Design a protein with these regions (language model features):
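Hydrophobic, helix-prone linear segments
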Residues: 26-30, 36
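Bacterial N-terminal signal peptides
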Residues: 7-18
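Cationic, low-complexity basic patches in intrinsically disordered or flexible, solvent-exposed regions
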Residues: 566-570
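Positively charged n-region of N-terminal signal peptides that target proteins for export
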Residues: 1-5
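Contiguous beta-strand segments within globular domains
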Residues: 34-65, 204-206
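Non-catalytic cap/lid and distal C-terminal segments of serine-dependent acyl enzymes
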Residues: 69-559, 573-574
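Boundary at the C-terminal end of the N-terminal hydrophobic targeting segment
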Residues: 21-25
Length: 574
């Protein structure tokens, strides 16, 4: 691959016209306009020795990534590699290891793909950390066998060329879920996925049984199932956060008494959304045709659509809706909060059908991607789409960053054999939308299907989908939800009322909507199960009267004062 230093710096430079109002903070991207200084700062990373193959050193693969973070008390408890930090964008640089023979790798502005540079212009106190990413079995750069350095404190002078040496002293171990008395960790080989990838592929889940499941004298023997799809970056280990509450005797009247299945939705490309694609393989079919039947053979589960519920937040929310619509004979009800775009005329702030670029709007201003609430009607834009894509490019220009846009491309774009990666939705330098790829994406536009498939999708949404989203969603996902809501309600006005709903909750953002959604969805799940004879009758007292979990008041939206680590991962249990 060609080096991408210049295109990425050009992307950052082009941000200047609209970035002044965004208070970009540490990056000071406007300095990218200054002429290159005479000094040349370098970072030297000692690479591990290569294994011998038939007497010769094996070729190197993967990327070396440098993460930078201002040495600031507000981020003292974070390591640079804990990013990207969406509320305090950080410089990132990376170098491909392809063709590298030396054991000492030089990283500077001339060799690296850089976001937030040039590196030569850094001044003052920073911390830098190196990561060697040679694994492609897990999302992101923390896969088994990958290595990292300790964070190194540096103090850059404006007029002195300096070198920093980093040693890769840490090794990431393969992820192992923690032992928990109320969780069973299950794995099952997928024949469909193994055939697609021509290697062994397993599907995984964390299982939480309800109170009474293992009691032979308990009156209920067969149980409904709630399938939980984690949000972006989440895994089946989300079960650990929820197990004690879900299996508690005291929660029986407030929490659906079901077997809760926490799925894994991560691939090397990012969140696959159980959406079949050339890149991710038949992940949806594997879930429905292999994994769910396996669970229903192994456990005492009611094998009927009305007994299978699916829920999720953010990317997990989009996935829950997708599964309910794609497999109506499997899932009988869906509960989704703050889903990824459900109407591509509002793909965050971009109309995929009419706009030319993801980076700029019709007025020429920068398109925002992530915001925070400042007041009743005021937001602060922390990150633009240009920022976000440039960050992903700096992590891996070949589409393997594991971040959000690369994950969307893996789900919805055609696979490009020449690139050995999904085809990008837009030009990484200009943001210009690739119309061929966009046409492929439209097959996954839920609102478009509501309008165009003769009422089938509209009926399913109206009958089976319960959707909540804050009006101040951090990623502007409320705009797509509002448009889908209008289209479904227009269909309902012509046809009939149904138990599903789409509601926008005033004042809540991407994170603060989750406790409200949890309370509301638990109540809705209980009502659904009772309506189908799958739950005990409602108690004579409400959760608020009994003090059971789920009765806690919903707090007003608040913002974390420190930088957010991967805000898209705020996938709370529903």
């Amino acid at each position: 691959m060609p080096r991408l230093t210049c295109p990425i710096l050009a992307s950052a430079t082009a941000l200047l016209a609209g970035a002044a109002a965004h208070a970009q903070g540490d990056l000071a991207l406007d300095r990218a306009l200054e002429p290159a200084p005479a000094k040349q700062d370098r970072y030297l990373v000692k690479l591990p020795q290569r294994e011998l193959v038939e007497g010769s050193p094996a070729p190197r693969t993967g990327r070396l990534i440098l993460f930078f973070l201002r040495d600031d008390p507000r981020t003292a408890d974070r390591e640079p590699m804990d990013g990207p930090f969406f509320e305090r964008l950080q410089p990132i640089a990376s170098v491909s290891l392809e063709g590298v023979a030396d054991d000492l790798l030089v990283v500077d502005d001339r060799t690296a793909a850089v976001f937030g540079g040039p590196l030569d212009l850094f001044e003052g106190a920073w911390r830098v950390q190196a990561v060697l990413d040679q694994d492609f079995t897990a999302s992101g750069f923390r896969g088994p066998g990958n290595r990292a350095s300790e964070p190194i404190a540096i103090d850059r002078a404006p007029d002195a060329a300096e070198e920093t040496v980093l040693e890769l002293t840490r090794t990431f171990a393969a992820a192992q879920p923690p032992a928990h008395p109320k969780i069973e960790w299950l794995e099952r080989r997928s024949a469909l996925l193994s055939a697609h990838f021509r290697r062994e592929v397993v599907m995984r889940a964390g299982i939480v049984r309800p109170f009474g499941y293992d009691d032979l004298s308990f009156p209920r023997r067969m149980w409904p199932t709630v399938y939980v799809v984690p949000g972006f970056g989440g895994t089946r280990e989300m079960a650990v956060q929820q197990a004690d509450g879900l299996a508690s005797r005291s929660a029986r009247d407030a929490v659906p008494q079901a077997v809760w299945v926490f799925l894994d939705s991560e691939t090397p490309w990012g969140h696959h959304g159980f959406c079949d694609s050339e890149t991710n393989g038949p992940v949806g079919r594997a879930l429905v045709e292999e994994f769910i039947p396996f669970l229903e053979e192994r456990m005492r589960l009611v094998a009927k659509p009305e007994a299978r519920l699916v829920t999720g937040h953010s990317s997990g929310g989009w996935t829950a809706i997708h599964l309910a619509l794609a497999y109506p004979d499997t899932f009988g009800a869906c509960f989704a909060s703050a889903p990824d775009p459900v109407d591509f005329t509002a793909f965050q702030r971009t109309d995929l059908y009419r706009d030319k670029s993801f980076f700029t709007g019709k007025d020429g201003g920068e398109t925002p991607s992530y915001r925070g609430i400042l007041g009743p009607s005021d937001d602060r834009v922390f990150m633009t789409v240009r920022d976000e894509m440039a960050t992903e490019q700096a992590l891996d220009p070949d589409g393997r960053s594991g971040q959000q846009w690369d994950a969307w491309e893996a789900k919805w774009s055609p696979f490009d054999p020449a690139r050995n990666a999904p085809r990008p939705i837009c030009d990484p330098e200009t943001g210009d939308i690739d119309l061929v790829v966009a046409e492929e994406w439209t097959r996954h536009d839920i609102a478009r299907r509501v309008e165009r498939d003769g009422g089938r999708t509209a009926r399913l949404v109206a009958e089976r989908v319960r959707l909540l989203c804050g009006t101040r969603d951090s990623f502007y996902l409320n705009e797509a939800v509002a448009r889908l809501k209008a289209k479904v309600e227009a269909w309902q006005a012509r046809e009939r009322a149904a138990p599903g709903f789409i509601k926008l909750v005033e004042g809540h953002d991407h994170g603060s909507i989750t406790p409200l959604a949890r309370i509301r969805f638990h109540q809705e799940m209980l009502a659904h199960l009772r309506a189908h004879g799958l739950a005990d009758p409602a108690p004579s007292t409400t959760p608020a009267e009994t003090g059971l979990p789920g009765a806690e008041p919903v707090s007003p939206p608040v913002r974390d004062a420190r930088p957010a680590e991967q805000p898209r991962e705020r996938a709370q249990g529903l």
